[in-house]
Amino acid sequence: NEGHRGLVALENQFDVTIVTQNVDDLHERAGSSHVIHLHGELMKACSSRDPDNPRLWQTLTPERVEIHPGELAADGSLLRPWIVWFGEAVPNLEQAAKEVAKADIFVIIGSSLNVYPAAGLVRHVPDGAKIFLIDPAEVRVPSNRAITVLRLPASEGVKELRRRLLPESESL
């Protein structure tokens, strides 16, 4: 949607890293070049024995989206979707925290800030970094941080974010 494409447009001016809890590939399809998936990726299959080993991942395609019962990964274990199930560790959380710790601008889109551990990433934002939250719903924000809240749907909020970050931009 326009929100995804708007984030891609920001890559022309900023070093953008997307950290997402979504398991779809919409950011990649829109053209984002650096995406960290906290909860895995629906279009990847992995080893049930070693799910976080990218050498054992298989990329699924629209032509081949099913994993059949009994299908094996390269290490001989059962093949499974590369999705973080309830109760499993979030393998990319440390990588995400390191990226957040380098941010000059941190943008939260479509989050209640209630789902942990992802909601805790805001604690890693450096002092002095600008923080924006885009969500049409009222969200309780941490009182110890200055957060600019844009109560808008994602597409409209990203457009407004671009206006604020790139006031001279004429592509809006």
Positions of the model-derived regions?
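Conserved catalytic alpha/beta core of Sir2/sirtuin-type deacylases, generalized to analogous enzyme cores
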Residues: N1-L172
